Every structure is written in C-alpha cells, then in structure tokens.
Amino acid sequence: TLGTVTNVEGNFTLMAPENSTLVASFIGYTPVEIPLKGKKIVVFKLVPDAQSLEEVVVVGFGTQKKASVVGAVQSIKPAELRVPSSNLSTSFAGRIAGVISMQRTGEPGADGANFWIRGAATFSGTTDPLIFIDGVEVSAGDMNAIPSEAIENFSILKDASATALYGARGANGVILITTRTGKDLEKARINVRIDNTFTAPTRTLKLADAVTAMKLRNEAILTRNPDGTPAFSDDKIQGTLEGRNQYVYPNVDWFDYMFKDYSMNQSANLNVMGGTKKVDYFISASINNDNGMLKKDPNNTFDNNIQNLRYSFQSNVGAWLTSSTKVNVRINSQIVNYNGPSTSMDNLYKYVMEAPSMYFAPVYPNINREDHTIFGNKSGGPIGSGGFSIYRNPYASMVQGSSKQSAYTINTAFELEQKLDFLTKGLNFKALVSFKNWSKTTVNRSFSPYFYELQNPQEQEDGSYLYDYNSISKGRTALETSTSTTGDRLMNLQATLNYQRMFGDKHDVGAMLVYLQREYNLNNPDNNYYNTLPERNQGLAGRVTYAYDGRYLAEFNFGYNGSENFEKGSRYGFFPSLAVGYLISNEKFFEPLTKVISNLKIRASYGLVGNADIGSNRFPYLTKVDLGGAGFVFGDQWQTSSNGATITTYGAEKVTWEIGKKYNVGFDLGLFNKLSLNVDFFREDRKDIFLRRNTIPAESGITGDLRPYGNLGKVRNQGVDMSLDYNHAVSKDFM
C-alpha cells in the first residue's frame, strides 16, 4: 500500500503501478475509489458524508445529535485535554465552561485537581460529580489515569434534564467519557507518544533571611518596651551578616537546602487500534514517571525524594456474534508504585515555613565519630512537654524515613448489545455488568533523629571555631516499620431498553428505560460494624424525546432511586425533569440569514435532583448504641460504677432526601459555520440539606455527636456559563 497527502491547494503526486486503484478520503467526506488504468492525471471530487457531519454528543446512557440536545451538555475534543501532566483533571481549568478546577498541590501522586460542576450546591456529604467511563462508574483517580489518546468523547452534564437519568447520585453533575475503538478502521493503526516535561513551582514565598529576622525581632521587643533586652546580640547579628561560620552563626535558607528548582518527568503511550466487519479492538499502554523536588540526603541509603510511577492499560474488544448481536469486553488496569518521605509534603512545607533560620544548622560535623547523623536543634522551642522543648528541624523530618506505596486497580466490564428490529424498528437492548477492585499497601520505615545543640564556640586566631555539642534529644538508628492495607470493591449492573425512530419526514421519537443497581464494599473494614456492610443503591430511569421537523424539541427525563440511608417508606425518591428547545435556524423564514447565522437555538429546562449522601454517617434514622459503655452510677452506690449500653448518636426517623430544584435557560449561536457561542443561565435551590440539630438545649444531655440529623439546610447556587469557539482550517485563504 502506498500513500501520500495533498498540499493546501489539493494537489498531490504519487508513484504507483499502472493497474492500481487510488482511494481518496478525508474526515467528513465519503471516500472515492478510481482505478488508475495507466492514467497520469486523476481528479477526485469528494462529497460530504451527511452521517459523518451530523455531530453526535454523548449524553446519559446514549448519544444524541448535537442539534437535538436541549439540556446543558458540553463536549470537549480529546486533543484539548492533552497537557504536560499525568492527571487528566489538571486540563479542565479554563477549558470547560461551568467547571471550577483547583489544583491544591503539585506533589506527584496527589496533584490531581479538585473540580466542581457549577460550584458546590450542598455542604453535607460529597460535592464531587459522578464520573462514568464507557458506562462504568469510576473514581476521580481512575479518570486521571486515562491518557487523552484513549479518549473518543468527553461530555459534561450540568442541568437537571441532562443528569436526571442518574437520579440522586447525579445531583452534582456528571462526567461521561467514552474510550476509543477500532470499529471504523479496516487496517491496524499504531500511535506512539513520548514526552519529557519540566515541573517547577509557579511561585514560592520569600522568607526573611536570618539577619533581617533577628533585627525585626529586636525592633519588636524594643518597640513594646524600650528597656527590654534584645533577643539577639549585636555580635550574633554581625557574625551572621559576615558569614563567619555556618554552624556558629547559621543563616539557613530551608527552601534552598531541601528543595530543587525543578524536576523532570517522563511519560509514554503506545496504542494499537483496528478492526474488521466482525471484530474491532483498541489497546493502549501508558507509563508515567513523576518526580518530586526534594534533594537527596547523601548519608541515607534510600532516596527520600518522591517518585510516582504509574502503569496504565486499556483494552476494548468488540465482536459481532450475529448481524444483530454484539458483545464488548473492556479491561482497564493500573499499577502505581510510590516512593517518598515518611513525613507528608504538606507537613514538610509547613515545617519549612515555621523553622527558624538563625538558631541551628540542619546538620553538624560528626566531630566525635558518633554512629548517627548529628542533626542541629536548640532547646526552648515550641515542641515538647514536661518542661523540655525543642524546635522543629525540617531537614531531619524530611530524611528520617521513607514511605512505599503500591496500589492496584482493575476495572472489567462485559456488555451485550442486541438489536430488536424483529419486534419493531429502532428498538435495541443493552446489558452491562462491571466489577472494580482497588487495593493499596503502604510500608513506612523511619528512624528517630538525634538532636544536638551547639555550645561553647571559641574563635581561633586563624578565624576558625572550636565548639562542642550537647545532646538534647536522643534518637534511634534502627528503622521502625509499620504497614497498612486498604481497598474497596464496586459492582454495577445496568439494563437499557432504547427506542429511536423517525416517523415520516418530520417526527423523530425516542424513548429509553434504564435499570441500575450498585454495590460497594470495603476490602479491609475497620471495627465499625457499619463499615462491614455493603452499600447498595437501586434505581429506575427513563427518557422520552421528541423533535418535530428538526425545529421544535422536547425531552422528559426521570430518575426513581432508592437509598438505604432512609427508613422504609422514605427510601425511594422520584426526580423528574423537562426540557424544551427551538432551533430557529431551521425555520424557512430564517434561510436568508443562514450564511451569517449558521445556527441559532434557544432552550430551557427545569427539574428536580436528589441527594442521599450524608458523608460517612450511614443509616442516620437508626439510634447508634455502644455496648461497651462504662462509668454508670446508680442511686446511692456512688462509689461503685457499672458497665452498660451507651447511646452515641440519636436516630432521626424523619430524615429524607435532600432536594434541589434546577433551572436552566440557554442559547447556542453559530456564525459563518466557524464561530460558536454557547451561553447558559442557571440557578439551583437546594433544600432539606443534612445537618445535625443545634437547637437542642445542652441541659438535655444531647450534645456533640449525640445530636440527630435533620433536613435543615438551604443553598442557592446561580450563575452563567459561556463558551466561545472558533474553528477554521488554516490555508492561504484564512478567512
């Protein structure tokens, strides 16, 4: 097979045998084949492929034509998600209207962004959106591990009409990701990407040096009391200014001593896709190596810097068993190996901010040939008890141990698609079963630092100093080891019956019914009895759509969901939504304007959403009793106490669903088939938010965690989303 590409004017040159057949193809156009038969010049005329040009948007449990969408749904091209980062969520900021994204840390392994769809509409439980990849619920960590090269479609569902199918669990918005397949390819395609990136802080705080800090401290003391005694002598300040000796007159820049200016990270992705009329496949393998910015201690046998090494694998295989039956098998797995200091990066940064720069050096020379590192410190600091206290040495905290973590994730899904045209045209059935298992093992090893205080410094004739040390905190050279394991399992079951049919030339009717079931378990539950029980959710959802002549659009959605968090009689909630749209640009009277205004659609929606998440407090309607209570005294037997049952939390029998009313009005405007503007005005009124009751008098003895929950809170969340896009192929005729 030979191939070539045209220039910007459409001309091409290709050396080919005389009996060859030339094939010309372009995205959005129907391929054309012309037998060569000895011809020297061949002219191709491609015609638009109406089906390819009809853009499709991924919505809840299916797809819709973009022109028919009446909900607040935004799609983003996978290419726009490609950023020099190992986490997909870091690409959201500034690219998706209505999504608030915040990266709280750049620490490898923890640098995924927190994000909210249209802000936070509740202050109980989670505010995170629901995330689905290929119809399977996943965590934000699973989403972050998906390389952008593996993504086919990426959609954000914002309003009630778009999220109602997910019921209570979609109250905070939904993210839908579809991975790639090879179904449109006859020949295998191999793609390789290798990146090397630099990471550096955008800004660091500039702390005062030792001389400035000492002068300011003395100034503060004398300002309060002119007769007061300065904290630092003139000799101390002058010796530090002149840099006479780094141990006697320390001037430590803890940031520079512990952190590098930048780090280098590597990533690579290899994917293969292809297929035939019977079988299609997509296989992707990725590796990401992210490094921290800590400097290595040459005295340690281990590297205390952070390294987060992640391996990701994605496999999608589909096969047509018959002309109407297809099965899809999808497997996603991740292996994450983390190595870093035993002290968290948050604490290390905090310690650097708090550490004095003038009292002690990070380490002292081992003049007495001790069998351990001589870490600097000074008595009289803020840490300690019983009349003895020292300061924090952040360098000792950084190098005193290491933490190794190994995490394994496996997501598997089996899907069956069955066309039911033999019953009625446009009817099909889909069943999906998925299973996820995640486990994590952590091993921490650390020693206890030996801290010394420099004393009796004596300057010699040659300007050098003699001094000795006083041990102020004895440590331990032997490594102490601790381990922990955690993990969870998630199983989902979905059954979808979908109907889509055009009646005549003007009536486009669609309907869908979905059954959902979910079970979540902890692999290593603690002693809390509730954590040993599986979390189960069940629901029924439906959608009905109607479009008349491609101009008048209507959609009704509902979710009927059950939650174990409420008592019988209150466990199920019904959450409907209604949306309408008017595609003005498809009207006949609008035809003279279509060369300028290529698209104009107005839409509106209203619906209810529910929330049953009360954080970690399960079964709030039950009164929780601890049978291990002690210290009970009865009658005049005040010298004798007894054991017995203790109420830890009073139940709230009437607690029920948190309800939100969502309103959305928007319009889509297209100009010259190049410029598109999408604007949405939204408001959500959330009521019956879960809160502990604070109005119970303390004299009743019901205080703290004893207080029951109630549907008490209210939140109003409103704003505007806007996105502006310009798409045009660059050529000599740019405009």
Q: Which residues make up each language-model segment?
A:
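Short, small/polar-rich motifs associated with maturation and membrane association
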Residues: 1-314, 326-327, 386
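Extracellular/periplasmic, surface-exposed regions of secreted and cell-surface proteins
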Residues: 127-128, 262, 316-324, 330-335, ...
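Long amphipathic alpha-helical scaffold regions
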Residues: 348-357, 576-584
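Active-site-proximal polar cores
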Residues: 451
